[in-house]
Amino acid sequence: MPLIGKGNQAVGDLGEQTAADYLVKQGYRILERNFRSRGGEVDIVAKDRQGCIAFVEVKTRRSLAYGLPQLAVTQRKQHQISKGALAWISKNRLHECTARFDVIAVLLQDGSEPTIEHIPNAFDLAY
């Protein structure tokens, strides 16, 4: 898919779809996408083959001019994801579940297959 003329939202959406497809191929089950709560958000909530819930932040770039995508997951962003994860767990009454925070970095460049880097346990719960 050509990226020229695509806005940041469209590129981000494509990155999230690419990440979700990747997770499914790895044996994950997607439970929810783009979960929002008061002060929190999670791009993808998925369950791995061992039954662990992965709260996944997806960062997408068209080039490395501004650095690696995963470096954009700041302390503030980790806090927002943590709040979203806690809200999702509460909403779904899964207080005893095993969970972790992953980051998937997606590099989308015209004429190339997407480059995907999955970082399980990328960070701990941030209060």
UniProtKB/Swiss-Prot annotation:
InterPro entries: Restrct_endonuc-II-like, tRNA_endonuc-like_dom_sf, UPF0102_YraN-like. It comes from the Bacteria. It holds the Pfam family UPF0102. GO terms for molecular function: nucleic acid binding. Belongs to the UPF0102 family. This is UPF0102 protein Glov_2230. It comes from Trichlorobacter lovleyi (strain ATCC BAA-1151 / DSM 17278 / SZ).
